[in-house]
């Protein structure tokens, strides 16, 4: 019952934030304090249970990784769309001859498709770097608590799966 109330309260807070009706104040130092305060205002002491077995350090580290993971995915999707557009243009303009430059000087004629394919290869390497970054980012720190873990019996694997992390941080200090 309490878990459902917390979940519903968080959904209401998310809605308020998205609609721009959530009141932020400098008196509360970060988003976590804002959310916990709003939840406690809605639910009383039940709202304080939001961070049971989860320190604010835990929450910040986890939120940062979730934020970065979403950003990486958006950037990767954008680069993929750009690659598709370049390939489509290269296929459409496969006979188009354009000037090629070296050291900012006209060098020789080249095919536009060749230049566009070059950009796609570079984008491919960028996407590989993003995939590596995502893999390194997508490790769940939640459960590390403030420093050396929590004494409460928590199921980190269940949380990992629910949040879509590939692995659990093997050391709470990392």
Show where each model-derived region lies.
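A helix-coil-helix interface module used to build multimeric assemblies
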Residues: 1-149, 153-162, 166-167
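Amphipathic, heptad-repeat alpha-helical segments used for oligomerization and assembly
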Residues: 166-174
């Amino acid at each position: 019952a309490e878990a459902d109330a917390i979940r519903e309260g968080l959904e209401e807070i998310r809605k308020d934030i998205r609609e721009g009706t959530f009141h932020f104040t400098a008196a509360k130092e970060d988003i976590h304090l804002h959310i916990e305060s709003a939840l406690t205002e809605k639910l009383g002491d039940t709202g304080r249970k939001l961070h049971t077995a989860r320190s604010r350090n835990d929450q910040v580290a986890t939120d940062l990784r979730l934020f970065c993971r979403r950003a990486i995915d958006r950037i990767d999707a954008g680069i993929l769309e750009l690659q598709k557009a370049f390939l489509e243009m290269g296929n459409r303009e496969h006979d188009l001859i354009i000037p090629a430059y070296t050291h900012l000087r006209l060098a020789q004629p080249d095919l536009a498709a060749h230049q566009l394919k070059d950009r796609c290869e570079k984008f491919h390497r960028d996407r590989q770097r993003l995939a590596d970054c995502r893999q390194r980012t997508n490790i769940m720190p939640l459960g590390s608590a403030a420093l050396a873990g929590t004494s409460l019996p928590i199921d980190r694997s269940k949380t990992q799966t629910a949040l879509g992390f590939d692995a659990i941080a093997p050391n709470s200090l990392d």
